[in-house]
């Protein structure tokens, strides 16, 4: 039985988990990744040790936040996102696309605590249409302390409800299931209570926003904490972030999960491709009427604004991403680094590959501690930090290597073929929807031949069009 089937089987057995909601938001959905982790066989979440690095707090962002909450109250379209998506020369191209698509749109932006992204707000030509949410973080700390007793009461009521639900169920099958139940009883009430407090505060912050026609979440905590408490009647929308594959805990839900929290599941989805639309209709609880296919707005706007690199393709580019797709990332670096060391050796010694150099692009959530780890273990490679322009690098790369990163799809659109390194037994068909070439410790020599290279690239581009 696949991980997906195991999770859905667990959820169908305990469907009451979807009934514990805060203004229509099912709190359990925040725990699907963690439940999946336990079901997959890892009894405890493991953390990779690396340098803890935090970006600055910008008082000016907090001040602007306080001022703009009042200034923007007549806006018709509210977009919730994060400065983490300022990945293209300091701009959030997907948010810009949404601002053009919907009337009188403004963007509410969480800080990422990544300096290169947070500071980009100050240089943005569209700054007047952005409102940092930084002040919420400050106000929440004060508000939650003042309402600590209420939070404790909410937590205990939720815990009692969970205990009662589970006690009425018979046939807990094994130790893993018991472990999951204990975890949910311990942790889910905390999330429930903090969500109630968070929604209370957002209700106060947005209480005078009476002209809302559209509320859009683009990885901005909108669907959980903000959209459920906005005033008036409006359309709730979510822009797809990342590639949705056969199993994605943020989109693939069991049948009948939407019977209780109807408003949460009734949101409109803006998707990248027809294959994703088909997947959500057939495998999840969404209907065709809820879905609009728009392509990948970030890539569309990037090519429109910046074009594509005309420089020589010099890199063999590895995209690092232990946080993405993968719930079992504890051994990621110890497995990836030896493979990359072998690739570096091949580039140094094999005449066919000597004109290329190994480069590593960090995931946006990997910091300088990881940069140092790669540089220490593979000193001849070039490591690009988490703020480097991904699409620019793809345009300069002859080949893209990854374990499970969905950058594969983006690479194909920038004419860069992808090969996979093995990791945790994942199959490319399960992750990407089609077969992808794999390597162990050596790059495939056939791709040096231009005809085979072009044929493989054409294959990847054709497959990618289903998803992008």
Give the ranges of each region predicted by the language model.
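Catalytic-core helical/loop segments in enzymes performing group transfer/polymerization on anionic/lipid-linked
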Residues: 1-468
